[in-house]
């Protein structure tokens, strides 16, 4: 973790949250207590900030300073509002292409996906505030800097983002093996948002219920699945092919 992207100390983190800083995640000492810690918990809940309980040894590795049982990571980018981004892309007259990541949790996979998204002309990436990979040094490095070129939106709930996209005339397509349709039978040369699931659980069943279409990649080997960043690349480049 880069030291310039850290905030340590309970009061400092509370002030950063209240000031609107882009907090990616807060690491809290597992046995931390007290009124100030309760105040921090309330602030994180109010602003839907991701956090996890960790042993004090991990906090000591993150910073040699007096962390008081809490260390936060700050995003190296500024996130954009979903409505602002979608409306601007729709009004631009181009054929929108969005990518939704349903609680993808690995920062390196996130970075690899951002890199492919930038190369394929994705207009924006949408992630959920909780349960998603942070935008940290690993993300920036794996993306080869593409993270600074692709708008990223953080939303409270993926389903609300899907409803907004659908209401804006954008078709939502879920990448899932729970369908008979392959990617090659789905029309991707129209306004579309592709949804990729987490590494271990895939797309949430409640999300699958509300998408417009589902598609899978044909598999011919004995291994039943691909790494999510590889699968995402296949979906995005099929979209590019159809739009040529």
Labelled PLM ranges:
Residues 1-88:
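N-terminal positively charged helical leader segments and presequences
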Residues 5, 29, 102-103, 128, ...:
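Glycine- and other small-residue-rich loops at beta-strand/loop junctions that grip anionic moieties
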Residues 14, 20, 141-144, 205-244:
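Structured adenosyl-cofactor binding patch, chiefly the S-adenosyl-L-methionine
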Residues 15-21, 87-181:
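RNA substrate-binding interface of SAM-dependent RNA methyltransferases
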Residues 31-32, 56-57, 130-132, 199-201, ...:
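Short, acidic/turn-prone active-site loops that include or flank metal/cofactor-
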Residues 45, 162-166, 240:
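Surface-exposed amphipathic alpha-helices with a cationic face
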Residues 173-227:
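Active-site/ligand-binding-proximal alpha/beta "capping" segment
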């Amino acid at each position: 973790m880069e030291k310039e992207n850290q905030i340590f100390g309970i009061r400092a983190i509370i002030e950063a949250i209240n000031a609107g800083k882009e907090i990616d995640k807060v690491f809290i000492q597992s046995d931390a207590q007290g009124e100030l810690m309760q105040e921090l918990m309330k602030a994180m809940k109010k602003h839907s900030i991701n956090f996890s309980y960790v042993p004090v040894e991990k906090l000591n590795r993150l910073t040699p300073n007096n962390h008081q049982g809490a260390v936060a990571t700050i995003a190296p980018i500024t996130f954009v509002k979903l409505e602002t981004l979608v409306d601007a892309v729709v009004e631009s007259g181009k054929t929108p292409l969005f990518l939704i990541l349903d609680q993808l949790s690995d920062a390196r996979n996130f970075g690899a996906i951002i890199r492919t998204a930038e190369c394929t002309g994705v207009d924006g990436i949408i992630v959920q505030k909780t349960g998603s990979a942070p935008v940290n040094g690993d993300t920036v490095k794996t993306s080869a800097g593409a993270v600074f070129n692709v708008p990223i939106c953080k939303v409270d709930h993926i389903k609300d983002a899907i409803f907004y996209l659908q209401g804006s005339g954008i078709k939502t397509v879920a990448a899932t093996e729970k369908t008979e349709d392959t990617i090659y039978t789905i029309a991707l040369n129209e306004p579309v948002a592709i949804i990729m699931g987490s590494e271990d659980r895939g797309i949430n069943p409640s999300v699958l219920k509300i998408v417009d279409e589902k598609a899978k990649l044909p598999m011919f080997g004995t291994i039943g699945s691909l790494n999510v960043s590889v699968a995402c690349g296949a979906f995005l480049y099929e979209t590019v092919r159809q739009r040529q």
